[in-house]
């Protein structure tokens, strides 16, 4: 698997994981979990974008 594709997939996974944590934090009133989930989601979004850019350069 090419690096760009791998990076993009890992980013999507981190984004999804962060969204779940963020939602769980909202439902339980756990502000710390909500913040950590949002941070992980943002990191995943950035990683996904980096993967897409790498894929363009791998062509």
Curated annotation (Swiss-Prot):
Ranges of Basic and acidic residues composition bias in the record: 1-24, 33-59
Pfam families: CsbD
Disordered as annotated region, ranges: 1-59
Family indicated by similarity: Belongs to the UPF0337 (CsbD) family.
Protein name: UPF0337 protein MM_2677
Highest classification ranks of the organism: Archaea, Methanobacteriati, Methanobacteriota, Stenosarchaea group, Methanomicrobia
């Amino acid at each position: 698997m090419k690096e760009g594709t791998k990076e993009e997939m890992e980013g999507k996974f981190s984004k999804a994981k962060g969204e779940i944590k963020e939602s769980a934090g909202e439902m339980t009133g756990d502000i710390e979990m909500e913040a950590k989930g949002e941070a992980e989601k943002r990191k995943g979004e950035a990683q996904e974008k980096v993967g897409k850019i790498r894929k363009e350069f791998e062509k």
